[in-house]
Amino acid sequence: MNEDINVTFIIPPECRNENECSEEMQLAFTACEQHSGGGIKAQWQAQTTWKKFVGLTKKDVFVVSEFQGEFFERLRLVGPRCISCCLTEGISIPSGPEPVFTIAMRGLVVTASGLSKQQKENIKKKVHWMGGLYSTVLTEDTTHLVADTVLSDKYVKAVERNLPVMQDTWIEAVWESSLRLNINAASSDFDNHKLPPFANLQVTTTGITKKDKALVMKLVSENGGTFSGAFQSETTDIVVLNKDSIGSEKYKAALEYGKACVLPSWVIDSAARGVALPLSKYRVAGASTSSPLSEHRAPDMSLNFSRITNLRPPSNFVDESRAVDISTMSSRMKVSI
């Protein structure tokens, strides 16, 4: 470092002096002192007496114990663990526009799919707080996708590029761990937060053997999905069948409502790989190609409809075990997207 970095440790209002600050703040200050003369000048300053909010440069670094409150909002800050880790590992202190509390996501570029606006905002905030970058689009630089659906273009692209697809619980787990330990968000320790291959999918079958049906039920249930014995246009996402079952009632209903029809091997192979594989190699000949999993198109918006249990099967409900006649489907019940 050619120029000194001024590192100011802020004493919160509830503490009378630095001795009452958290152990982590004091350890971080000690780490800075060990580098005094090497480009770092550290000092303690009470929050209640600090008045300088203008004229600051990238050489002015503030360390606070909590990322909240008026003081936090007015300054760009780093956390004590961020300081300690940077000094221990001999890497530069972050100087970007966002506050950085830890460096658990340093070097990562994260995007999200299928989540609410509020969830995405929280992910963006936490990623920045952990030294990572957040993007609204999936690019060549993207390293991780956070999603709650396998029915999106981002998911398909992520699988094609072998990018990890994580649940939003990954963000919180890494955040909580990084407050206590010097960890890397890309570590295999967080593999249990990967998005299951059939996450939030409802799957049904038609015309396959009892043995194959039992296997499909088991794999779907164990890997984040839900198995249903009946087809219902508002909730069914995938119909699993053999090539000689294309005359079944469920198959006809799937065609009418644009649902994906695939071979049982799609379920088996996807479960083995740990991701929902593209459907192009598993699609039953003549079946719908509207699924984003096969053709990279926008997801069927009916996947987001509320799932309502009816006392009486609606007209767009097919349960072959009850010999429901497909002719009862009324055109006025058809979902129009």
How should these model regions be labeled?
Residues 1-337:
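Eukaryotic intrinsically disordered, low-complexity regulatory regions
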